Amino acid sequence: MKWFGVLGLVTLSECLVTIPLVKIKSLRENLREKDMLKEYLEKYPFRLTHKLLHKHADSGVAFEPMRNYLDIAYMGIISVGTPPQEFQVIFDTGSADLWVPSIYCSSPACSNHNTFNPLRSSTFVASGQPIKLIYGTGKMSGFVGYDTIKISSLVDRNQAFGLSVEEPDKILELATFDGILGLSYPSLSVKGVTPVFDNLWNQGLLSQKLFAFYLSRKGKKGSVVMFGGVDPSYYTGELHWVPVSKPLYWQISMDSISINGKVIACDGGCQAIVDTGTSLLLGPQDAVLNIQEIIQARRSTSGEYFIDCDAVNTLPDILFTIDGIGYPVPANAYIQKDAALGICFSSFEGNEDISNNSEEWILGDVFLRLYFTVFDRENDRIGLATAV
């Protein structure tokens, strides 16, 4: 272990920079209220294999399934340029690039979001490099520029980012957020582009090469992402460290998923991505269908799995065992309620592309609201502790 072990994490917590995150209405909720969810789920099924196995086809193209952002619920504010222009972005550990809408974008998705005007920034430098992020539902295309990015008190100079010129995706039009700030490994970014976190570290702006998330369960406020240190007041007990199994995504090995001592999924071990850009618990279709049956969730005409809201008081915890440590997810976490419609639904979602022989999961915000999470790039590991 490097010099900044657990004690280092605590003693250097005063050096960290904390960015507030605000809980927002998810795209799923917006689609459900507009009676568009069924059509969307049928037309754009999520493909987890794309997220796990993608390799860049060329220097300017990256594949990111927009389905991943259907349930995103937290965003924070950054600014771009001099003087600063503000944007609401998703801090996403499941992708690596930063992009925001630009004034050159004429798509409907750009007309109702903040757009960056490079002509009003004295520090903007155009690169001429095209960029295309291909989603499960469409694409975001544009070009790469360089400018000053401000994240709370951090001033990230000469940062490469994407400026959208075309956003034909209907989901981006309905999104509350303006853009995405990726926090995954550089190997996932568009070739030649240094991600924000790496640029911050290279400029000596961080005391430790790590960041952490606390996602509050107490309403819209209280959630934070912190850079360069860890604030122990956000968790109880000790951090348990899990090695990253594949430094592309924040991917780890998981031992099993069980209820009352009986393994119900991930039997014999599997892989899991810890992903702040996903809200639900995603896994192989067969395994998830088995879990839906166990918790008595019923498939609706929209394709979602609904459940009796009173079941939250009777259903058991579901235990995710990671590196020998059990992380229980209680019913009040894996059952979510749409307050506007007064209905409850399962937080598990299946993916038809994955067979049980190559079982992979994504642990999204349902899991992360329960467990404070540290993403340690120096040691390629993830730290988990019970969130306060």
Curated annotation (Swiss-Prot):
SUPFAM superfamilies: Acid proteases. It comes from the Eukaryota. It is found in: Secreted, Extracellular space. Disulfide bonds join C105-C110, C266-C270, C309-C344. Its main location: secreted. Residues 74-385 form the Peptidase A1 domain. Gene3D superfamilies: 6.10.140.60, Acid Proteases. Residues 1-15 form the signal peptide. Glycans are attached at N356. It holds the Pfam family A1_Propeptide. Keywords: Aspartyl protease, Disulfide bond, Glycoprotein, Hydrolase, Protease, Secreted, Signal, Zymogen. The keyword Disulfide bond applies. The keyword Signal applies. Trophoblast and placental tissue. GO terms for cellular component: extracellular region. GO terms for biological process: proteolysis. The active site is at D92, D275. It is an enzyme of class 3 (hydrolase). PANTHER family: BETA-SITE APP-CLEAVING ENZYME, ISOFORM A-RELATED, PEPSIN A-5. Belongs to the peptidase A1 family. This is Pregnancy-associated glycoprotein.
